[in-house]
């Protein structure tokens, strides 16, 4: 068993289109990079998680500040499924997720585990002749980014 940093990427434009399903939101090619390696023998419960967007800190929190701690999450998962060697469990992200654009450099750092660095690539346009097309709404932005995000001229109502 071990721990690693992960960048839990999501394309929330599909959230409304797919009636809440997270398959396309979280399951596109290149999503969820993990690394820089798996580290064992580290107690991450007091680790600091930091996310950088183009060198600027946009998320900064302790693992111990999570609403559901690692011990609770593992116990809850084990009540419902068998965990096998090699299974990856993502525990969540600190508040203040931010949108990314092609060319942005995203770094996820967990103290004791290292720093994962990724550059956002342009994704191919969806095939307009097949399936539901991506769309964005104010409600989706609020869920995806948190209510404190300044969306510019996008109005987010309560």
Task: Please place each PLM-identified region on the residue numbering.
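RNA pseudouridine synthases
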Residues: 1-6
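Catalytic-pocket segment enriched in acidic/His residues
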Residues: 12-155
């Amino acid at each position: 068993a071990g721990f690693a940093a992960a960048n839990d990427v999501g394309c929330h434009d599909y959230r409304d289109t797919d009636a809440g399903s997270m398959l396309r939101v979280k399951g596109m090619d290149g999503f969820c990079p993990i690394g820089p390696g798996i580290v064992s023998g580290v107690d991450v419960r007091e680790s600091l998680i930091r996310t950088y967007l183009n060198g600027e800190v946009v998320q900064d929190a302790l693992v111990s500040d999570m609403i559901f701690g690692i011990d609770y999450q593992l116990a809850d998962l084990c009540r419902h499924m068998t965990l096998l060697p090699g299974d990856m469990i993502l525990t969540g992200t600190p508040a203040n997720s931010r949108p990314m654009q092609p060319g942005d450099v995203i770094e996820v750092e967990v103290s004791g585990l290292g720093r994962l660095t990724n550059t956002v690539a342009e994704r191919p346009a969806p095939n307009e002749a097949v399936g539901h097309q991506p769309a964005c709404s104010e409600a989706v932005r609020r869920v995806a980014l948190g209510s404190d995000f300044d969306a510019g001229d996008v109005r987010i109502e309560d």
